Amino acid sequence: MNDTTAAHRLREQLKRFVGIIFPHVPKLQKEFLGQMFFGIQAGQTTVLSRIARELKEDILLKKTEERLSRHLLAAKLDETVQDAVLAHGAAYVHDDTIVSIDPSDIQKPYAQEGGMPLLAKVWDGSRGHVGDNLGYNLCFATATPSMSRRIVPLRMTMWSAKEDGFTSENDKVLDVIGKIAEACGKLGIYVYDRGGDGNWLFDFFIAEGLDFIVRLVGDRHLLHWNGKRLAADLAGDCEMKYRQRVTFKSHGRELEVPIEYGSLPVRLPDHPGVELRLVVVKWPGSEKPMMLLTTLRAARSRRSLQQVVEGYLTRWRVEETIRFVKQAYEIEDVRLLRYDRLKAMVAIVLAVAYFAMAWLGLREKLAVLADHVKRVSRRMFEVPEFFFYAIADGVCRLFARHGRWNGLDGPDEEPEDPCQLELALQ
């Protein structure tokens, strides 16, 4: 397969993606989404003027940009796109699928209040509290199918602490989890970092009947056979029955560390009738063990405990996914002066990431095409560490250099070789 054929097949797949994921969207809005998906990937950008430039239309660039800007204001566009992606992605979620929930943000360090709509102070990870940086909050949710290293984006919701009706970040996160649970039939194992060590989250999970793995801070009281005790004290007394070496990525580095782990039966004081397990993990050099509270009550054998430990470590790969989405499509460079447009753009970027990660990256029928896209990326750069960087870079090169977007129903530039054309249409 040559690059021209690959680019043609990619455009055809993008058309199919729009048609299948958004079957009930009006035709004009569907055409707009196709243009945005193509332009964002061809330019790896969320800046409207650059997206318009990648469309290469036979009209003034300004007119293309103005049209895209108008369509971004369509009523409930963000909800339409978010719900469509989630409805399709729910098919990847089963009983043992890890559903990772990770709050993040869009930092606008050079923006000033009044320059962009509803800018608010966001979390500063280096300081451990809300700092002086302005921006918007995100909640990113992904699914990792069992026995797979691939990641499926499910939802990426943006909000501002200054928007009308805002109550708390916790309520926003619970709204995201609730919509995922409804779409997935309450399947999956929900994984949350230490920020989820709060009654607000445990009450919700238990009330909704959802399985979870949540990392504890250690200062929470739990019920054990010998009464109420701090989680950290219970962890110190836990027998480490099993040992193994695990490999995971953290902060861009692949680490292999020896760990020891064990578990204890516990209950929450507010929910004494719900049986839980406290899984304790220790590794060399750590000051205190990692404590994971889970509903997976069978977490006693090596195999079942390993599922809990690896399930939580899978959540750390979401950090790579968030970096991929932010860097590959420059989402933090977004420049829009209406809040509704900002939310719609974030939803559209989610759909673009879903096209690259789930539509191309996970489907066996498109394995040959995805492999060629990765090879295009390798020719231009060193092999990217993260699989989806290779996909995004390859799609960018093929879209930008071979043909242009001619609409969902418009004629496409076909490969010159008839044999290649036949392959492209299979």
Can you say where each PLM-predicted feature lies in the sequence?
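Noncatalytic, typically N-terminal accessory segments of nucleic acid-processing enzymes
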Residues: 8, 50, 60, 113-116
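Short, contiguous clusters of charged residues that form electrostatic/catalytic patches at enzyme active sites
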Residues: 49, 136-139, 171-175
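Short, positively charged, Gly/Tyr-enriched micro-motifs
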Residues: 17-79, 145
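Single, function-defining residue in the core of a domain
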Residues: 1-42, 84, 108-112, 144-426
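Active-site-proximal, Lys/Arg-enriched surface segment
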Residues: 37, 65-148, 260
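Generic, well-ordered alpha-helical segments
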Residues: 43, 60, 133-135, 343
